[in-house]
Amino acid sequence: MNILRRGRLGSNVKEDVMKFTTSLEFDKEIFESDILCDIAHTTMLVEQNVISEENGKKIIAELKKIAEKGMETLDLDPSLDDIHMVIESELIKELGEDVAGRMHTGRSRNDEVATDLRLSLRKKVLEIITHLITMEKNMLAVSNEHKETLTVGYTHLQQAQPVTFGHQILSHISAIERDISRFFDTYNRINLSPLGCGAMATTGFNLNRKRTQELLGFYGLIENSMDGVSSRDFIVETMANISMLGTNLSKICEELVVFSSAEFNTIEIANEYTSTSSIMPQKKNPDVAEITRAKLSTLNGELVTVLTIMKALPNTYNRDLQEISPHLWKSVYTLIDSIQMVDGMISTVKVNKERMKENAEKNYSTATELADTLVRECGIAFRMAHGIVGELVKRSIEEKVEIKEIISEVLEKNNLSLSQEKIDTALDPFENVKLRNVIGGPAPEEVERAISSFNEKISAYKENLDEKIAEIESVKENLLK
């Protein structure tokens, strides 16, 4: 029986109501965090002389036993509502209510669950960052391998300008690097303690909130008690980061699907990330990229669901907040799985250099550089040069001739001239790439510089990550030793 019901409500409760309202199914995500929270709170109660040292030692010793045995060994009775009451009931069963019943002094499940969520989520955020750093390292290796691999870039999925495949990979690395930065920023706002806020108005007991903050490795306090129990903005912020990263990863999946098709044929996805057809024996389908793309799309829905649950809730705690958790954890695991899939596909992709080069050499991808050359060499306005090259492309298509065959005629008509050497250079796609050596450009030496810069950032991120992992591992070790 739920020990909370024996007073105000009585013991009668409908079974379907219990099953409908329990959170035990997804409380496994906060089990360890709840134990850590209980130990920290109990330690502080002893230090503040709120409970006796003898009772505190008994409670903490039993909590450590529960942690060691694991959640699966507990009586997960849905009538107990949640993992907090399951653990407290287990303590009472082993120690008696006069001892175990003192653990919850000065605390509510409201500040308890808010603390647990922050403890668990900070660990998951570091796990996400770990996978992202691994993926970025692997992508940087691919970029470095192909810093001189000529290909064509697209706008509107129409061939645009020559680039290198290494530069194309760097475009995704650049976006993901910002995602890593966002997760680190969010971590600092997750890692704040609401413990001690009580139900919503703190407590009359002489608690030391800064002590539990220290014991649990939080960077600071959520000071206002009403905000402390009601705020889930740290979850929304994390899920927004997840959704943004999911969008960035979905673009990679889309490129894997499109560019591996026979029509493009510039890359080939490794066999282990593909499947075949049940009827068409020739097929090699990019199933993993497609499924990953679809799963990443669900992240937006999870975020909107959480925002909708939170919208216009009365201030402080409402049980609606319980329904946020499953959407959070589903998003986290979907993202982690997806990162690993994208990492695997990019790391093992085969590049068709000849096809990439062929695409870069046709469909007028060098037209922009030809216009730029007219500006530099002939001193005309870019808009005029744009019009002249546009006319060249139009005639080339209509007359089915190469630009080289008609350029002298068109230039002469416009009282302009250009040496054959300048024309050849302007129309050479790799020369186009080499010329674009400004910061962020596709020139091989600039790609190499960018790779070095990203490697330095990744090293700094890894150092920061290792420090944070060590901090939370130290908390666990100190509380459970």
UniProtKB/Swiss-Prot annotation:
It catalyses: 2-(N(omega)-L-arginino)succinate = fumarate + L-arginine. It is found in: Cytoplasm. InterPro entries: Arg_succ_lyase_C, Argininosuccinate_lyase, Fumarase/histidase_N, Fumarate_lyase_fam, Fumarate_lyase_N, L-Aspartase-like. Pfam families: ASL_C2, Lyase_1. Pathway: Amino-acid biosynthesis; L-arginine biosynthesis; L-arginine from L-ornithine and carbamoyl phosphate: step 3/3. One of its GO terms (cellular component) is cytosol. Keywords: Amino-acid biosynthesis, Arginine biosynthesis, Cytoplasm, Lyase. GO terms for molecular function: argininosuccinate lyase activity. Its EC number is 4.3.2.1. Coiled coil: none annotated. GO terms for biological process: arginine biosynthetic process via ornithine; L-arginine biosynthetic process. SUPFAM superfamilies: L-aspartase-like. The keyword Amino-acid biosynthesis applies. Belongs to the lyase 1 family. Argininosuccinate lyase subfamily. NCBIfam families: argH (TIGR00838). This is Argininosuccinate lyase. It comes from Methanococcus maripaludis (strain C5 / ATCC BAA-1333).
